A protein has these predicted regions:
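FAD-site-proximal beta/loop scaffold in flavoenzymes
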Residues: 16-22
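Flavin (primarily FAD) binding-site architecture
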Residues: 1-5
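C-terminal catalytic lobe of FAD-dependent flavoproteins
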Residues: 34-35, 77-174
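Short hydrophobic/aromatic-enriched beta-strand-loop microsegments
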Residues: 7-14
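A generic alpha-helix surface/boundary motif
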Residues: 12, 70-71, 130
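ATP-dependent carboxylate/phosphate-activation module, predominantly the ATP-grasp catalytic core
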Residues: 14-16, 67-68
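Active-site lid/adjacent beta-loop-alpha segment flanking the redox-cofactor pocket in flavoenzymes
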Residues: 6-7, 22-113
Length: 174
């Protein structure tokens, strides 16, 4: 039993990202397409940064697989047909800690002085400022802020999942 968290409802999955060769300004915001499960934006250096679906199996490897690349590239070209001739410069895989309901765990842990902030799925990088503020409040006051009060570990054991329509290791897929 590790720190009282031997039953964490989290799985690790690889989420791939890709960068194209630089090009003139094309996209000045982050574009997402829920149905195609794609996000794309343009870096300051001109490369398009895009990604999408998870690899379909649990892994701690920091590399992706070809079928996911093909799926994500096809979604990108569907959204922006002019991308079909761009060269891909690099790709990588990041480990996503996927909770079973698609929502993070931000709460006091099962042991005194232990606090949990995990299971962020796809939203961790984007939600970090607000979540950090709520997490700091939880640690300082030893009680949750109203904004993270529902994001407890015990919700999985009490049948109070937060995103039932997106339950499972693929929260965006129903």
């Amino acid at each position: 039993k590790l720190a009282g968290t031997n039953k964490m409802p989290i799985e690790a999955h690889v989420l791939q990202a890709f960068v194209t060769e630089p090009l003139k300004p094309l996209i000045n915001t982050v574009v997402t397409w829920g149905a195609g499960h794609l996000y794309i934006s343009q870096s300051d250096k001109g490369g398009l940064v895009f990604g999408g679906d998870l690899d379909g199996y649990n892994s701690y490897a920091q590399r992706g697989n070809l079928p996911i690349f093909e799926h994500v590239a096809a979604a990108a070209v569907t959204m922006f047909p002019n991308l079909s001739r761009l060269k891909l410069l690099r790709n990588w895989g990041g480990i996503m800690d996927m909770s079973m309901d698609g929502s993070p765990i931000i709460c006091k842990g099962p042991l005194p002085g232990l606090y949990l902030n995990a299971g962020w799925c796809y939203g961790g990088f984007k939600a970090t400022p607000a979540a950090g503020w709520c997490f700091a409040y939880t640690i300082a006051k030893d009680e949750p802020h109203n904004l993270n009060a529902a994001f407890t570990l015990d919700r999985f054991y009490n049948g109070r999942e937060l995103d039932e329509g997106g339950a499972g290791p693929y929260p965006a897929h129903q």
